[in-house]
């Protein structure tokens, strides 16, 4: 039986109680700790009621759904990296999706047609592990989690087009990556080969180098082994130059850190491939090595090969010690980082190769730091000029020959006992025969000129980047659409037979890939000869699904194309992509690669998938713990601790509620289950409301920097929202008392000719705020400073007391503009209050700056005497400097400091007058 799960109907939040603004009480009377109580007094700010009402309205109106049809509006595609459906949101999710939503709402107000979709990265090993633990199919676990997380996301008030939702574990999605795989296979961009891989013996799967930590599997913790297994590869190295060169297009649009990481990961280097001839079993052959330092070739004193290299295998055939050593080398990680830290060990094979320049015999060693999967599986060793080679040579007493001149005194500062004294810089060649006295470039060309005609060397460009092995020996993933036939070998599935559907009623037991034991899945017929055959049971690396999901959002339900070209042309590239920097060299590189693959299949246009990238900072929180008698550590949830804070809001004392005894206040660390310092967004939303949580996550720190979570600090944004509620309440009451209609206030032009000084100041602050927030969001991508600006404007509004109909109109303008801008960050209260003020929130635009409101009739200038402030004066802007000097000297509070001779008078236009007095 094959279960075909579909995403369940979307949840709608509705309320039978509508808050009102009539006779609203002040914010200060609301109880912070009881905002989730359904108070009978509807005049208080009750976020749960307002937010449920607004969310229900948005869902009913399908407010945020967008069409693929042409539009008069410019399009904008905003996307945060979609989540893995773990079942529960964390604060990192909240921050990530709030950033995207703020930008989405801002651009809608600016007149853009904005697409902000959401989907689910459904495949992956965590679902298998959960299925094993809970004895339930991963499909059931995954889709139940999707339902739960969708409901949580909706509580945040995100302006998502839910009609475009999909999960990557649905056949309707993954059939298209199977289709693309077949197209690439036809082109030779997919191939199968034996590969030495990191094998996790517990999870029974291949691990990428990045998933091996200190020689152990990142999830299971088991010691990793090396194994040779057949795997499918994407030929990403064919696109290495383009992937590297196109990073230039992203300069200024992506964080420089990410661009640098990708440049280093691709790692293009120019050098020379050198051939060391040898005779073996009567056959002539050569050991090929790549080097970026051919100038050191005369300093080669040994060569090192991987345990899997043919020379090492030949040497081990009749030598048990070498065979045992090669077997030892296969135990452990193939990750470069682990190899760099591991002790360098080796064994002399007894074989030699011929030095191409000197004709001397060079010993061949097998070494644990050489990988068969990197280059040719062999390196030339120059101990005098390479730190790793020096370490190895000194350990095994191998010759060290200096061939690069070392400046006098270069090693004078080396600490006593430092055994690594290799000189690795470029300089003039010495001890190199005919090449003595040459610099690097001269030696490169001279050696090439001598060796290339003999076919002993050639110029070569090499990459650190390796082809992408996408086979995974696990169940919960996209089936690879290939068949293994006894007669025909490896045969691709016919396109008309796609998708190859993954059985979904499987409960894995943790012992290998269960697909191998499902005859209904494995047994098939060969597409080529029709004889019985077996399906491939490996599944795709889950990075495959996440490498093209952004493009599928343009046409998520297209049944005839992987990506609809017309829809892709409207929406792609993604205008703003948001996610963690930890994805810099995996997901982001693979997505760039897939975009180029899809471009070459004429599915999308352009060279890059993401026009702009923001990497948001992590959410951190305090830790509280006790060290137990056995040395173990117990971490406690913040909710279980009573904390005393100092005046700066820093915790100074922590008591465990259950026993009244102190606990240690630990470091601020990334929220994690292991440290019990995570904060449940649901609890926080229930207490303060989603608008407050949204404001807090963006106000507290710049979006690209870490956020230190503090429950106590939530009260600041919460009090701000309550203040806005109070201001709106009092304003509506004032309009009622003055018998003014909202219709007239919203439509009549404001007469600014005879405004009071206070009214002009409020208008000026309003329009300064409009301009500043527009610049912060639209140009600087600064998401925290607009909240500060909104708070300042709210303070001005709170202090302003309208005493006439005209001033009420000024107040009304300021309040509506404040609410429009606030609705970007706190959409529930913002839109609710705008509706209370008679405005249609569907057709609202971002307010325009009235330049005339920024003109000041009078400005305040500071007066200094010898650099110290001694007074202030109100003057007309751009007043005559001589008049300003005279006016400043005449002020009584200033004159008493002018007893000495006036040496100089400095006027900084519209800012200050500084009088310099002798003595």
UniProtKB/Swiss-Prot annotation:
Compartment(s) of residence: Cytoplasm
Keyword Cytoplasm attached = yes
Q: What is its main location?
A: cytoplasm
Q: Keyword annotations for this protein?
A: Aminoacyl-tRNA synthetase, ATP-binding, Cytoplasm, Ligase, Nucleotide-binding, Protein biosynthesis
Return one GO MF term: leucine-tRNA ligase activity
Residue positions binding ATP: 673
Catalytic reaction(s) noted: tRNA(Leu) + L-leucine + ATP = L-leucyl-tRNA(Leu) + AMP + diphosphate
Q: Does the keyword section mention Signal?
A: no
Identify the GO cellular component terms for this protein.
Answer: cytosol
Q: Which InterPro entries match?
A: aa-tRNA-synth_I_CS, aa-tRNA-synth_Ia, Leu-tRNA-ligase, Leu_tRNA-synth_edit, M/V/L/I-tRNA-synth_anticd-bd, Methionyl/Leucyl_tRNA_Synth, Rossmann-like_a/b/a_fold, tRNAsynth_Ia_anticodon-bd
Sequence motif: 'HIGH' region, positions? 83-93
| Entry EC no(s) | 6.1.1.4
CDD domains cross-referenced by the UniProt entry: Anticodon_Ia_Leu_BEm (cd07958), LeuRS_core (cd00812)
Question: What Pfam families does the record tag this protein with?
Answer: Anticodon_1 (PF08264), tRNA-synt_1 (PF00133), tRNA-synt_1_2 (PF13603), tRNA-synt_1g (PF09334)
Leading EC class: ligase
The record's Gene Ontology biological-process terms are: leucyl-tRNA aminoacylation
The text of the family note is:
Belongs to the class-I aminoacyl-tRNA synthetase family.
Q: What is this protein called?
A: Leucine--tRNA ligase
